[in-house]
From Swiss-Prot:
Its main location: membrane. Residues 1-38, 110-121, 197-200 are cytoplasmic. It comes from Ricinus communis (Castor bean). GO terms for cellular component: Casparian strip; plasma membrane. The chain crosses the membrane at residues 39-59, 89-109, 122-142, 176-196. Belongs to the Casparian strip membrane proteins (CASP) family. Keywords: Cell membrane, Cell wall biogenesis/degradation, Glycoprotein, Membrane, Transmembrane, Transmembrane helix. GO terms for biological process: cell wall modification; cell-cell junction assembly. Regulates membrane-cell wall junctions and localized cell wall deposition. Required for establishment of the Casparian strip membrane domain (CSD) and the subsequent formation of Casparian strips, a cell wall modification of the root endodermis that determines an apoplastic barrier between the intraorganismal apoplasm and the extraorganismal apoplasm and prevents lateral diffusion. This is Casparian strip membrane protein 1. Glycans are attached at residue 153. Pfam families: CASP_dom.
Length: 200
């Protein structure tokens, strides 16, 4: 007497239908990992650019001293960033921003190696937002003083100094432009981090 076990055709069809689903989910996971890794690599490149722009802004502003070639017995005409508290704040703030960006590079590398890590991406998003706020405040404040240096204010009897201190104004203007470049880079970094977290 022999015993035979019949396997229903439906169960075998279901079993056959499950195999492709596993492969599809694995393929989808790999595609998502490649997408996140691409974002992480672009994030690292943007951070390198932001480091250059932030430190360039601080260095340009910090070396903007100019002394006029003529002087009197009691006065020597010179202009420097340390004559303006706003420019002093700018140099300090951009120095902090540049230092943070340098320290964030290793975390960005970790995000490349582990593209699915949420903690690193969330930490960078929070710190990038703080640095963006500081960068924007410094750039906006310095831009207002640079405008006054170029154009003055007749209502307040503030004279434009850029006619006399051309090199000084050129350097501080360059520093402000570089700081706004880093603001734009930070905006891209924040948006990219938010997109990467949303796709998780």
């Amino acid at each position: 007497m022999s015993t035979t076990i019949e396997i229903p055709a439906e169960s075998s069809a279901v079993a056959k239908g499950k195999a492709p689903l596993i492969g599809a989910s694995s393929s989808s996971y790999e595609k998502k990992g490649g997408y996140k890794k691409g974002i992480a690599i672009f994030d690292f490149i943007l951070r390198l650019g932001a480091v250059i722009s932030a430190l360039s802004a601080a260095a340009t502003m910090g070396t903007s001293d100019e002394t006029l070639p003529f002087f009197t017995q009691f006065f020597q005409f010179e202009a420097g960033y340390d004559d303006f508290p706003t420019f002093q704040f700018f140099v300090i703030a951009m120095g902090f921003v540049g230092g943070y960006l340098v320290l964030s590079l290793p975390f960005s590398v970790v995000a490349i190696i582990r593209p699915h890590a949420v903690g690193i991406r969330l930490l960078l998003l929070i710190l990038d937002t703080v640095a963006l706020t500081l960068n924007t405040a410094a750039a906006a404040a310095a831009a207002a003083i640079v405008y006054l240096a170029h154009n003055g204010n007749q209502s307040a009897n503030w004279l434009a100094v850029c006619q006399q201190f051309g090199d000084f104004c050129q350097k501080v203007s360059g520093g402000v432009v570089a700081s706004f470049v880093s603001v734009l880079v930070f905006l891209l970094l924040v948006v990219m981090s938010a997109v990467a977290l949303r796709k998780h």
